[in-house]
């Protein structure tokens, strides 16, 4: 177990946070640039994006645009800051997060401001494939689904961690890794009054942590139009308990089934 203490100065407007991440023995070796940045968000509900590296005075900034969709001009803005920075790099994680690493304090502050349009809470770091609007074999618009959920829950201002990171795939190809999400969705269809309607299969309790790997259990099919309503109701229930989704789910699997049953076909 490796503890990473992020100590950033007031100019970055980021609170100190302790981060715990499972790493192998090799990750304890000092001075290795490849092992200075751990996964973001580090723990449920943590939104701090500036990470102090092992090297004194060096920082990394995590940037997760909603749905992994980076505005084209954003790369130009980032490049303008890091082009003359020694050893600065932009790395892409499998969960669609960008890490801009090996930054000095002033550079980290500028990158932090430039990337302020990214995810502001755990739920907005949800993973989605590109979806049927671009993918030729995609069945459903996974990006559109994520955008509609984010828009629907935004007015409720749920506390960070109340809604979990979800994974959305537009089809069985599983590019959104829906099987490993705490809540996952996979593109499907549902017949309503004899007409095929856009829908998603619903998966629960997936996990990709080393040693705890498991696929989520498929619970049924939800119409795409019902999924935002499901998350609004779920967020309200968990908010009343003043818990995060993870803590709430530990003792409320049956309650989740009751909420989902309203929307499952």
Predicted regions, residues:
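Peripheral terminal and linker regions in Fe-S/redox and tRNA-modifying enzymes
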Residues: 1-265
């Amino acid at each position: 177990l490796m503890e990473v203490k992020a100590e950033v100065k007031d100019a970055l407007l980021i609170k100190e946070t302790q981060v715990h991440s499972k790493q192998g023995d090799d990750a304890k070796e000092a001075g290795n640039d490849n092992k200075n940045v751990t996964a973001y968000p580090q723990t449920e509900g943590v939104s701090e994006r500036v990470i102090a590296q092992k090297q004194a005075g060096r920082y990394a900034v995590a940037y997760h645009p909603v749905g992994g969709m980076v505005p084209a001009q954003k790369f130009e803005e980032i490049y303008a800051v890091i082009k003359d920075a020694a050893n600065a790099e932009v790395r892409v994680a499998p969960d669609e997060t960008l890490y801009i690493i090996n930054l000095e304090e002033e550079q980290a502050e500028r990158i932090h401001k430039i990337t302020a349009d990214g995810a502001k809470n755990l739920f907005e770091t949800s993973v989605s494939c590109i979806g049927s609007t671009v993918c030729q074999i995609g069945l459903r618009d996974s990006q559109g689904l994520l955008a509609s959920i984010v828009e629907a829950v935004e007015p409720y201002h749920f506390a960070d961690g109340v809604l979990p990171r979800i994974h959305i795939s537009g089809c069985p190809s599983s590019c959104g890794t829906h099987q490993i999400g705490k809540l996952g969705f996979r593109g499907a269809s549902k017949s309503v009054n004899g007409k095929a309607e856009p829908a998603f299969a619903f998966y629960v309790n997936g996990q990709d942590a080393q040693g705890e790997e498991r696929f989520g259990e498929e619970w049924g099919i939800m119409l795409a139009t019902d999924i935002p309503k499901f998350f609004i109701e779920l967020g309200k229930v968990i908010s009343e308990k003043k818990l995060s989704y993870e803590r709430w789910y530990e003792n409320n699997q049956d309650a989740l089934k009751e909420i989902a049953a309203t929307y499952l076909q």
